[in-house]
Design a protein with these regions (language model features):
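Glycine-rich, small/hydroxylated-residue low-complexity segments
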Residues: 2-444
């Protein structure tokens, strides 16, 4: 693990002590982030970021070897371990129970390779009186158990609050559930492996972003799902954000969901990009564009041949005026060579396969059209001499006419509940609701 960390551009691990016996091993490892190298590579004046040395922490590892291990108790397994980070160098900035480390992870690697562990971060607080800043964190506890070839992990924290002179933020009931195939070292390296996860925050309240204004969010959720196709050496990644309710100044929405699927990611391309990204951290900023072009020329075609997809599988919300629902699918197909220039829009359109649909309740569509019409009117010289009532009357008169015109042109289609629009793109030709539309950059 130490070697893997040292292969990362800005991280380092140093074994400070190592003592291996018949039944146990104890080690101290110093973990550091090389901010100085980052600063030097990006030509940042180091006086702007005063730092005597790179920030670091020391982790202590105690492992009791199996198959029968003796530690705090007796058990069966390949190894029983405990990793702790005292974090004493952080106590100048953050306060917590003096008898506890800032992080503790204790677990067992079973006889057949399954991993179970529990980890804890204690309650924390931080105060900067001059800046009027306060942070309070209730602490965090997690547990992992093996489930066949996977590891199941659940964790929770009661609350997190941050307050400053300008604003305050309070989160309650934080939790995370994960199921994964890989290990911690693989995750640190950025390797892709099959996993599912969901993080939740039951309530969020943000105050004083604007004077006297408060934003409240209920049940914010973030979900991920990674699938690996070993036969084709590709991965599919799905990410979803969801909010049950959000209320604030000029904001009142429920049942909000955004789901994005990125499919047919070539794993060799991902590994090459991670290596490039890692190495580029220490490359002077003026050299990065040229290095990026070298990477693209050497690796992009591999990804394009896998026919990647970026799909918005879900986009929906309910507003006071009504609800809308949308999706959009895009896929690059039939590419066996890069274009002469990546800015060749006609080339990409030829190889782009897309379809999209949006539906909206009638009242919501009318409200959106009214807003658009108001913007158009306000941009005209005549609007300068009109009262607010006259502007609103003009909008109410012209909005139905605009919607009818769009419907006659085939840009929208009226349904029983509202309006819908369908867009397709194939072989460089686009259509809206079945009506062909010209593209300014279509191939000739």
């Amino acid at each position: 693990a130490v070697n893997e960390i040292n292969q990362q551009a800005v991280y380092s691990a140093e074994v400070l002590s190592y003592d291996k016996g018949w039944f146990s091993t104890t080690a101290e490892i110093k973990l550091a982030v090389d901010f100085q190298a980052l600063i030097n590579a990006q030509n940042v004046d180091s006086t702007d970021i005063p730092m005597e040395e790179n920030p670091s922490i020391t982790a202590t590892l105690v492992a009791h070897h199996g198959p029968v291990y003796f530690g705090d108790g007796l058990g069966l397994g390949r190894v029983h371990y405990m990793v702790s980070i005292d974090g004493d160098e952080l106590r100048e900035y953050v306060q917590w129970d003096g008898q506890q480390p800032i992080y503790r992870n204790e677990g067992v690697v079973g006889l057949f390779g399954g991993l179970s562990y529990a980890d804890v971060i204690p309650a924390l607080s931080a105060t900067a009186e001059e800046e009027g800043f306060t942070l309070l964190f209730s602490g965090y506890a997690g547990e992992a158990e093996p489930d066949g070839d996977k590891t199941l992990y659940t964790s929770s924290g009661e609350s997190l609050s941050i307050s400053a002179d300008e604003f305050s933020l309070e989160m309650k009931n934080l939790s995370m559930d994960m199921s994964y195939d890989g290990d911690m070292v693989a995750a640190f390296k950025g390797d892709l492996f099959e996993s599912t996860g969901k993080a939740r925050i039951e309530s969020i309240e943000i105050s004083n972003i604007e004077p006297g204004a408060t934003v409240k969010i209920e049940n914010l959720a973030f979900a991920t799902d990674v699938k690996i196709d070993e036969d084709n050496n590709t991965a599919n990644v799905y990410v979803e954000y969801a909010v049950d309710k959000a209320v604030g100044p000029e904001l009142d929405a429920t049942d909000m969901v955004l789901g994005v699927a990125i499919n047919n990611l070539d794993i060799d391309f991902i590994k090459a990009y991670q290596e490039f990204s890692n190495n580029s951290l220490l490359v002077p900023s003026e050299e990065v564009p040229a290095k990026m072009m070298e990477f693209i020329e050497a690796n992009l075609l591999t990804q394009l041949k896998a026919e990647p997809e970026i799909n918005i599988t879900k986009l929906k919300a309910t507003l006071p005026e009504g609800a809308f629902n949308a999706y959009a699918n895009t896929k690059l197909v039939g590419i066996d060579a890069l274009p002469g220039t990546l800015e060749d829009a006609a080339y990409w359109v030829t190889h782009l396969l897309a379809d999209a649909q949006i539906t909206a309740d009638k009242a919501l569509a009318q409200s959106m059209a009214s807003g658009y019409m108001m913007g158009q009117l306000m941009a005209t010289p005549q609007a300068q001499n009109m009262t607010a009532e006259e502007l609103q009357a003009a909008v109410e008169q012209q909005t139905p006419m605009m919607l009818r015109t769009f419907a006659q042109q085939g840009l929208i289609k009226e349904t029983e509940k509202g309006y819908e629009t369908k867009l397709t793109l194939k072989d460089g030709e686009a259509s809206v609701n079945g009506t062909p539309i010209p593209l300014p950059f279509a191939p000739q």
